[in-house]
Amino acid sequence: MPSLMSFGSCQWIDQGRFSRSLYRNFKTFKLHEMHGLCMPNLLLNPDIHGDRIIFVCCDDLWEHDLKSGSTRKIVSNLGVINNARFFPDGRKIAIRVMRGSSLNTADLYFYNGENGEIKRITYFSGKSTGRRMFTDVAGFDPDGNLIISTDAMQPFSSMTCLYRVENDGINFVPLNLGPATHILFADGRRVIGRNTFELPHWKGYRGGTRGKIWIEVNSGAFKKIVDMSTHVSSPVIVGHRIYFITDIDGFGQIYSTDLDGKDLRKHTSFTDYYPRHLNTDGRRILFSKGGSIYIFNPDTEKIEKIEIGDLESPEDRIISIPSKFAEDFSPLDGDLIAFVSRGQAFIQDVSGTYVLKVPEPLRIRYVRRGGDTKVAFIHGTREGDFLGIYDYRTGKAEKFEENLGNVFAMGVDRNGKFAVVANDRFEIMTVDLETGKPTVIERSREAMITDFTISDNSRFIAYGFPLKHGETDGYVMQAIHVYDMEGRKIFAATTENSHDYAPAFDADSKNLYYLSYRSLDPSPDRVVLNFSFEVVSKPFVIPLIPGSPNPTKLVPRSMTSEAGEYDLNDMYKRSSPINVDPGDYRMIIPLESSILIYSVPVHGEFAAYYQGAPEKGVLLKYDVKTRKVTEVKNNLTDLRLSADRKTVMVRKDDGKIYTFPLEKPEDERTVETDKRPLVSSIHEEFLQMYDEAWKLARDNYWNEAVAKEISERIYEKYRNLVPLCKTRYDLSNVIVEMQGEYRTSHSYEMGGTFTDKDPFRSGRIACDFKLDGDHYVVAKAYAGDYSNEGEKSPIFEYGIDPTGYLIEDIDGETVGAGSNIYRVLSEKAGTSARIRLSGKGGDKRDLMIDILDDDRFIRYRSWVEANRRYVHERSKGTIGYIHIPDMGMMGLNEFYRLFINESSYQGLIVDVRFNGGGFVSQLIIEKLMNKRIGYDNPRRGTLSPYPTNSVRGKIIAITNEYAGSDGDIFSFSFKKLGLGKLIGTRTWGGVVGITPKRRLIDGTVLTQPEFAFWFRDAGFGVENYGVDPDVEIEYAPHDYLSGKDPQIDYAIDALIEELRNWNEELPQRPS
């Protein structure tokens, strides 16, 4: 029996009185720190100097005195502090601060312990993610200068290099040692930690990007001294030994070696949590573990927990703007709408004057009209999703006990008798709204059945059924099935030879409409010889009663027979297209004398792929009588239709929700969702978010048996840390460690809402600067292809190369020893500014140029073009060069940009170093497999190869440890298919794919490894190992220092050698 919960009578809230009193009380209460109710905290990133310890707690920086036991907060309100290091003299502290809602930028500050001054040092807005920390403290040189590691001036975000900071950030001197995370000094020698960042989200990592340690030898070269089979992180030096964290024995422990990488010793035997964040004052080592701080004395091998005590318990309420976290919305009867925000459901009128919260604790996912004065909703727990009913007239709620799995789509029939839900078990089912009893209609073998509709007479359910004709088919198709509630029988509405979708019934339930990719008409590619099917969707209609006329054809009634009975047998034979040109259609809504079609114009995928930009749709109206199509609304991202088919609710690209009557679309109104602030408990939210993160991992990890064993073992272990979490970043630390227990790639946390501090901004002009006396000089200006958009420093637009020019001022503000150029540029990002340049011989230039927000792409294209020129010159015009930065849209762009020219050289280098992965490697492999077998011989002009997109001669691919995911797959495929030699270093080793489908209540995206990649010969072995090259060529720190690229040099030499024995046959015109 369903459990019945009564919440008493319903009270509508007068919005004006509520909002004023809530905000007034909140402002007063928020300032009050509840010291009497302090709870233990999560303590992170400690460092030590003498008797002073610093650490991060509640996003702020604290200091603890080991002698007195006193603790005080020393830096707060900067953003989220996640790292801090004492300078060697202990007078200053370098602090890393992350900003932006999802902590997507980071910069460094100095804190002066003598006078309390806080000063921003870097203006790089370095990339920041939960899995790697860019623009961070790398170490200190023997003179006490800070050395940072940053990706800010590099062509790749995964390439962090070392810079010495001079004059409090006025000057940054590159060390030119290549990728590095840490730098230490021992006996006057530099010790480099490459990739020695933390990997809490991937415990047990063994791939090519695992941390390694190099040391400088007497010759000025570097040698690798620590290269274990597992990851190495947080290196520090005490005496003549290097200490670090690794889990070579299966669990994270502190190990050490001597300065030659020998005499490996294990110092700890932890079994609860991994140690993290090693730091030292040269005598003792400090670290955090399980939210507490410990001190390790290498001389005595003793470990002590530092008892700091309870510090801070911020007020356990968070107030949010509902529209910022809106997840689901739905029209109800009359002027009422329902929507879900931050896991809570609300019913309100359009104006927002009256707002009613559905009285169900977190977490609600969907809410739909459930009949007169009722809504049906899906709410989730860590066990699964459940159905509930709420009567907003009486205030009574009913929650059913049947676990529906993880629900990803929900609908309710117009009469409020049953709901239809689709879950991740690939089931579509009905749920009786009286008893809560679920009945499975059908289960797919291939995918979720989320594309469904219910007829207005509540008799039929039509849905898109995913299918493949064989277990190893490459494509999942979709056919329309119809379930008859009266006969409890399934009927095929379409054949199984295409992708049929978006079924919809008309108001009298006599006709079934749907969309289909059946109108194939290829469009030519404008860059290479290729075609694509861009506008293939067309609407179709099926009369459900045999003998009934097509409702979109104006057949006189006198010429048609009387309507008979429903007969769904062989209904696919009655399908006919509607007279609308093909397009990219997503939804169809039949009305009495017209049809609404939701269409998305053809567009590029770049913004959607990299920025998550929603597709902008257009609502079209097809008039059956005139057969004309008109535009109703544009810039839409989502759409809902009311039960009576009279009102439409839409979300637009501005993120707001609007409603309008179909009879008068111009009478559009904004749904005012933000008049009532959303109030929630931080503690309750964090527990729910942890539970959901744990459940997502349990239910989506690709190996079900392994997921069950791990999930049950770790649940309580990490949930015990959640009460210590007082900020969202605290919780993030717990969640990523929990995910890391699966020891598999692609376990990420992305996005979310961590702080209200705006992201750091940076201003760029695609130039490097160096300080010459009191002035900045342009050390290098970057450009790729000067004719391409966005590929050169804006200074080049004036026809001068600014290299060597002195920068006197920017908009009249002198920059140099007394004024940081990076600060000045950051304040002008996105605008134009006048820059005064001074060259040799008194040459002065005043230039108005655009200050860029980012210049990485320019630096990337400059790097590619420099490599291409080098390859062409060194091979004397016989070898071409292509770099592929990822296997996404940018990777496709860069491949085709160069392939059409570079493939015609006798040899070809395909460089996938630093490849960020994606999914298009197979498209690129397909092109590289094309070998020339003939030529077209014109009377005039030159030869044209056949196939047109084909490789002329020999190929070599270069890969490295930063090539991962689909970059791993490309590297293995290139090698396996024998396309040429693969050289470089072992790849990242992450090939269990992801398709994130759910967000946490604050917008956080969590990914779970769902699709394990298997190769012939390698099996599942590429995961957590990588791909070994045919020839290993290391790129050592001293190679970067000397300006050499040994991997490209080897590739050129190897291709030249192969071409010695390559005989090319070209056509000779007959006489």
Curated annotation (Swiss-Prot):
Write one Gene Ontology MF term: serine-type peptidase activity
Name of one Pfam family that matches:
PDZ_Tricorn
Would the keyword Repeat be found if you checked this record's keyword annotation? no
Task: Relate the activity to temperature as described in the entry.
Answer: Optimum temperature is 65 degrees Celsius.
Which EC number applies?
A: 3.4.21.-
This protein's gene is called tri
Q: Where is this site: Transition state stabilizer?
A: D966
Recorded family membership: Belongs to the peptidase S41B family.
Annotated segments matching region Seven-bladed beta propeller: 326-675
List, alphabetically, the InterPro entries matched. ClpP/crotonase-like_dom_sf, PD40, PDZ_sf, Tail-specific_protease, Tricorn_C1, Tricorn_PDZ, Tricorn_protease, WD40/YVTN_repeat-like_dom_sf
Keyword Cytoplasm applies: yes
What segment(s) does the record annotate as region C-2?
Answer: 856-1061
The protein's name: Tricorn protease
Q: Where is the active site?
A: H746 (charge relay system), S965 (nucleophile), E1023 (charge relay system)
Known SUPFAM superfamilies for this protein? Answer: ClpP/crotonase, PDZ domain-like, Tricorn protease domain 2, Tricorn protease N-terminal domain
Site keyed Substrate specificity switch: positions: D936
Sequence positions that bind substrate? G916, G917, G918, G993, I994, T995
For the region Six-bladed beta propeller, what residue ranges are annotated? 39-310
Which UniProt keyword terms apply here?
A: Cytoplasm, Hydrolase, Protease, Serine protease
Any one GO cellular component localisation term in the record: cytoplasm
Description of pH dependence: Optimum pH is 8.5-8.8.
Q: Where is this protein localized, as stated in its record?
A: Cytoplasm
